[in-house]
Amino acid sequence: DRLYHWDGIYGSPIEFGYRNKMEFSFGDEYKDGPLSLGLHKKGSTYDILNTDDCKLVHPDMTKILVCVREFFLERNASFYKKLQHVGYLRHLLLRRGVTSGEILVHVVTTTQEEYDLEPLKEQLLALPLEGKIVGIMHIINDSLSDVVQSDETRILYGQDFFYETLLGLRFKISTFSFFQPNSLAAEV
């Protein structure tokens, strides 16, 4: 006489490219190395590994990541150094609707340097993507902590939200919305 019935564990319907949100960090792969954009090296607070082949995200996100990294590499832009509290580039936050294919791009920087981001916007919009970029934002974050937060958000293109459908329900997803990062697994 059990109060519940155990159905077991169900896997995600897709194994790769399932995340609808990723936060990438700017940094260097080793001390004084070239600019990198990706994820923290295992066991390291400071070293950032380029993630040109991250299996967690849709290939659209990878194309955007590479475009953004190359744009700032060409301009020799600095990344934010947490201990010294100096530098410009902090994070790249990407959101992509699994059902809609709509994409939000958020470049998070400090105010310590200034760059014309219009050429970046044009390069991003010209990328051959499966989905569609519906918004590009420049988020200003001058806080000392290493979190993605907004002191100010500038919309460079489009809108700051997209819609996602989950179990027949329509959700409006914005930059800082809390939403299941694996939409399809939530439907299982």
Q: Predicted segment positions?
A:
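Accessory RNA-recognition modules of RNA-modification enzymes
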Residues: 1-188
